[in-house]
């Protein structure tokens, strides 16, 4: 499991993802706050991170990086409910995935498969299988 510094880094990364091109919408804020609660980060610390991002900490565990990528996929889908500019979100997600050290083939496959699922949400088991295939 990740330590507190890594948890703050994960959350800070998600906040940066949400703020990439604009302010955080209420629905994004609530989603991120839910992730913060899952990570045992207080609301005060979460609100502080919005204005004061922490330095990116690379996750050592491949499985933790996949989980974080899945969170970003979900966040991207929330962002795009009101926005039809799918290419900006896809590019943003692709770049964040590369920065996490995930394979570009897997990221591309996830982005491609998103179109075939309801609400563009790739089920966790499908996502894991995609990355597992590339990892082996």
Question: Each predicted region: which residue ranges?
Answer:
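Small-residue-enriched hydrophobic alpha-helices in membranes
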Residues: 1-18, 23-136
């Amino acid at each position: 499991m990740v330590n507190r510094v890594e948890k703050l880094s994960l959350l800070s990364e998600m906040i940066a993802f949400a703020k990439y091109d604009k302010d955080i919408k209420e629905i994004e804020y609530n989603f991120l706050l839910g992730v913060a609660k899952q990570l045992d980060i207080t609301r005060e610390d979460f609100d502080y991170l919005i204005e004061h991002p922490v330095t990116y900490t690379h996750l050592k565990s491949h499985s933790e990086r996949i989980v974080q990528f899945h969170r970003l996929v979900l966040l991207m889908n929330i962002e795009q409910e009101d926005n039809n500019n799918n290419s900006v979100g896809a590019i943003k997600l692709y770049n964040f995935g590369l920065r996490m050290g995930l394979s570009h083939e897997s990221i591309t496959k996830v982005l491609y498969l998103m179109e075939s699922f309801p609400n563009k949400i790739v089920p966790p088991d499908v996502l894991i299988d995609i990355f597992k295939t590339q990892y082996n």
